[in-house]
Regions:
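Conserved beta-strand/loop subsegment of P-loop NTPase cores
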Residues: 158-159
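Extreme N-terminal "head/tail" segments of very large remodeling/mechanoenzyme assemblies
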Residues: 1-142, 146-152
């Protein structure tokens, strides 16, 4: 069995400098993808979103997620909803979508409150129907690396160093 996930696509909405009003889709063509751009363009955010989508881990500088989600003050709103979707094919070629949804709310005296709204893995069954499994039914943070054919430790310490 070939331990590689392929045909990845990342959707980012409302994370750091990515606006909650726009959906940003990044394709990762085979065999190699280079992420280049000016300072502040979002290169690191793309890597952080890949890590969050695949392992559920926040970046170290995210302050419990409050600095990871687009700031409501910048959006001129009291709350911002954010989402990361990671589409990939597992080691056997079966397509999967991991969806992680968040909310950041501006409370009294400028305090920010982050909520994880949902985490879901979607796939298609033999009848072609979409099947969803939520974080309430399975440990998504362990399941996604398994579907990708690598351990969570490899993703965290080798791929997303």
């Amino acid at each position: 069995m070939d331990a590689r996930w392929t045909n990845a696509q990342l959707l980012i909405k409302g994370i750091r400098s990515f606006s909650p009003e726009n959906t940003n889709i990044i394709q990762f063509p085979k065999p190699l993808t280079l992420i280049v751009g000016r300072n502040g363009a979002g290169k690191t955010t793309i890597i952080e979103c890949l890590k969050m989508g695949s392992t559920g881990e926040l970046p170290p500088s995210a302050r419990s997620g409050q600095a990871f989600i687009h700031d409501p003050k910048v959006a001129d709103a009291t709350e911002v909803k954010a989402q990361i979707k990671l589409r990939f094919r597992n080691v056997t070629g079966k397509p999967f979508v991991v969806i992680r949804s968040f909310q950041l709310t501006q409370k009294a005296r400028g305090k920010l409150e982050k909520k994880d709204l949902d985490s879901v893995i979607q796939s298609t069954n033999d009848k072609g129907e979409t099947v969803s499994v939520s974080k309430k039914c399975v440990d998504i943070n362990a399941e996604v690396p398994s579907l990708m054919g690598v351990s969570k430790a490899i993703l965290e310490n080798v791929v997303f160093v």
